[in-house]
């Protein structure tokens, strides 16, 4: 009989695997973290350099470059990493595809580099959340909640440009660029009249309201463990088994403030609701962005309301239509893209008789 005795010394690979998957590290790395760290570092470094020093980008593909960096006159509000050129469209445009670095910069190559590495990095962040939960024996709902902002990022940085046919339609990486993206999105897709966007607004404002209500109710029903001269926060010890607040008192207060069944009497179902409400609403909003990417737009009321005599009855829809047209004609004003809403009307003759030539 042969007995194999293995040396107690671990190989370099085994030591690396143990370090990556160890939950005793101050910051958990994980296998997803091995990919997350370099991709997010690449995105952050390229974003910083481009925000400071990138030359103007021919975003519309008409040889009229738009400057977005500090060195070309912008500040923290107006600056942005400008999306890649409309001349590139949906082509993958790494630096080796350009004839020179100058051409790559002129066509907005840094935008694709930042966005693609960022999307890979945040996907790895989600995987790392699941991985750490798995190692600790926790349930996986943290990464499920994180999937809501993840879906929003994919909607505006990937799905919308794909649906529109060019990465130049992606959201610029800057403050004013984000607002410009929002205004153009409203002008072209009437997002404010899309029910999925309305659900997202309810999720954001509702989530903020529920969070404030929950925090204030808990803070108002703490079980006093200290004297009047001490802070109530000293009455809590990290890891204690006892409840730190009286859920019965909070339930009774809120049930009388509104009505009985508006208040939760189960702490677990309450916290599930606090997590599920904004997450599901953001999922639906991301789905709305993804459908509008392919021009399945919000409701429109292009035909005004008329009375019995055929006169226009002014409504809020008319105001919204006019504002949309105004934003649309200001967008890409030098690219000669006339709004289809205006171009679809009958042409108005400017001369009764065509002049004779010669």
UniProtKB/Swiss-Prot annotation:
Photosystem II (PSII) is a light-driven water:plastoquinone oxidoreductase that uses light energy to abstract electrons from H(2)O, generating O(2) and a proton gradient subsequently used for ATP formation. It consists of a core antenna complex that captures photons, and an electron transfer chain that converts photonic excitation into a charge separation. The D1/D2 (PsbA/PsbD) reaction center heterodimer binds P680, the primary electron donor of PSII as well as several subsequent electron acceptors. Fe cation binds at residues 214, 271. This is Photosystem II protein D1. Residues 344-358 form a propeptide. PROSITE patterns: REACTION_CENTER. [CaMn4O5] cluster binds at residues 169, 188, 331-332, 341, 343. GO terms for molecular function: chlorophyll binding; electron transporter, transferring electrons within the cyclic electron transport pathway of photosynthesis activity; iron ion binding; oxidoreductase activity, acting on diphenols and related substances as donors, oxygen as acceptor; oxygen evolving activity. The record marks 343-344 as: Cleavage. The gene is psbA1. Belongs to the reaction center PufL/M/PsbA/D family. HAMAP family: PSII_PsbA_D1 (MF_01379). NCBIfam families: psbA.
């Amino acid at each position: 009989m042969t007995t194999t005795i293995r040396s107690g010394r671990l190989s370099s690979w085994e030591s690396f695997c143990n370090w990556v998957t160890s939950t005793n590290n101050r910051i958990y790395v994980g296998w997803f973290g091995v990919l997350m760290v370099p991709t997010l570092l690449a995105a952050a470094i390229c974003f910083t350099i481009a925000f400071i020093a990138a030359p103007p980008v021919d975003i519309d593909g008409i040889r009229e470059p738009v400057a977005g960096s500090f060195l070309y006159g912008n500040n923290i509000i107006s600056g942005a990493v400008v999306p890649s050129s409309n001349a590139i469209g949906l082509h993958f445009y790494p630096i080796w595809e350009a004839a020179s670095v100058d051409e790559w910069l002129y066509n907005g190559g840094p935008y694709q580099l930042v966005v693609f590495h960022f999307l890979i990095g945040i996907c790895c962040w989600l995987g790392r959340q699941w991985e750490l939960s798995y190692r600790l024996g926790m349930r996986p709902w943290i990464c499920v909640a994180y999937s809501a902002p993840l879906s929003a990022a994919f909607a505006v940085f990937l799905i919308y440009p794909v649906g529109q046919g060019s990465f130049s339609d992606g959201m610029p990486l800057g403050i004013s660029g984000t607002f410009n993206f929002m205004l153009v999105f409203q002008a072209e897709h009437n997002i404010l009249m899309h029910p999925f966007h309305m659900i997202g607004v309810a999720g954001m404002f509702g989530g903020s309201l529920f969070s404030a209500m929950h925090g204030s109710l808990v803070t108002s029903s703490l079980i006093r463990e200290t004297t009047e001269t001490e802070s109530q926060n000293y009455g809590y010890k990290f890891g204690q088994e006892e409840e730190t607040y009286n859920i019965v008192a909070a339930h009774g207060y809120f049930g009388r403030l509104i009505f009985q069944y508006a208040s939760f009497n189960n702490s677990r179902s309450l916290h599930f609701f606090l997590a599920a409400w904004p997450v599901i609403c953001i999922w639906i909003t991301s789905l709305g962005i993804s459908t509008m990417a392919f021009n399945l737009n919000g409701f429109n009321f292009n035909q005004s309301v008329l009375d019995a005599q055929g006169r226009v009855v002014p409504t809020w829809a008319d105001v919204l239509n006019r504002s949309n047209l105004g934003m649309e004609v200001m967008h890409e004003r030098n690219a000669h893209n006339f709004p289809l809403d205006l171009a679809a009307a009958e042409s108005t003759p400017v001369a009764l008789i065509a002049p004779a030539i010669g």
